[in-house]
Amino acid sequence: MSIIPVTRVQRTTLIAILSAISFGLMLFPQVPIIPSADFLKLDFSIVPVVIGLYWLNYSASLWVILIRTLLKLILANEGVNTYLGLPVNLLVVLAFITVLKITMPNLEQYSNWQKKILPLISSTFVMTIVAIVINWFVAIPLYARFANFDIAKFIGLKNYFIGMVLPFNLIEGIIWFVVSMIILRAIQPLQRRFHS
């Protein structure tokens, strides 16, 4: 059941808690899933964002994304990698969440996994396209200029996109979706208590 808290205090408190958890999950665990691209790491910071999406609403999930991104920038800044990688991550997460909200506006009507196939495929596909486009036009040129890491020269664009970016984001999107749905199901009792 989609839940909107009855008070502003509840809403603000939950957004703060989810943002803090999401920030923590940006730092640990970080899992490389493509052997040839260990610099591309999966994290689970999306899960609290999805909780905010379905416990509260879309705008709440955007607040969680914004706050955890600012926390990362302020408290765990790694220099150039953060300045260049964080915007890419932000846009990919926004794409995933937006498509998820459009294709699966509430959980009540998508109670079984068969009904979740379209949202899974759609959100994963769109976030992958966004990741490819942002990497191509923004991240790669900026990394070459500011981090002295020319991907086209050291890895090759074909190898980078087909062998790294494409499979990484497809796997990441599937894992994000499946883990988020499992967690949402597991914490349903907390959801009811939060609303009571």
Curated annotation (Swiss-Prot):
Gene3D superfamilies: 1.10.1760.20
Assigned GO CC terms: plasma membrane
Keywords linked to the UniProt accession: Cell membrane, Membrane, Transmembrane, Transmembrane helix, Transport
Topological type in the membrane: Multi-pass membrane protein
Transmembrane segments: 14-34, 46-66, 80-100, 120-140, 164-184
Location in the cell: Cell membrane
GO molecular function, one term: riboflavin transmembrane transporter activity
Highest taxon above the source species: Bacteria
Main location: membrane
UniProt xrefs under InterPro entries: ECF_trnsprt_substrate-spec (IPR024529), RibU (IPR025720)
Domain notes: Riboflavin is stacked with one or more Trp residues in the binding pocket of RibU.
Similarity section: Belongs to the prokaryotic riboflavin transporter (P-RFT) (TC 2.A.87) family.
Cited function: Probable riboflavin-binding protein that interacts with the energy-coupling factor (ECF) ABC-transporter complex. Unlike classic ABC transporters this ECF transporter provides the energy necessary to transport a number of different substrates. The substrates themselves are bound by transmembrane, not extracytoplasmic soluble proteins and transport it into cells.
Complex and partners: In E.coli forms a stable energy-coupling factor (ECF) transporter complex probably composed of a membrane-embedded substrate-binding protein (S component), 2 ATP-binding proteins (A components) and 2 transmembrane proteins (T component). May be able to interact with more than 1 S component at a time.
Cited PANTHER family: RIBOFLAVIN TRANSPORTER RIBU
Name of the protein: Riboflavin transporter RibU
Species this protein is from: Leuconostoc mesenteroides subsp. mesenteroides (strain ATCC 8293 / DSM 20343 / BCRC 11652 / CCM 1803 / JCM 6124 / NCDO 523 / NBRC 100496 / NCIMB 8023 / NCTC 12954 / NRRL B-1118 / 37Y)
Upper taxonomic lineage: Bacteria, Bacillati, Bacillota, Bacilli, Lactobacillales
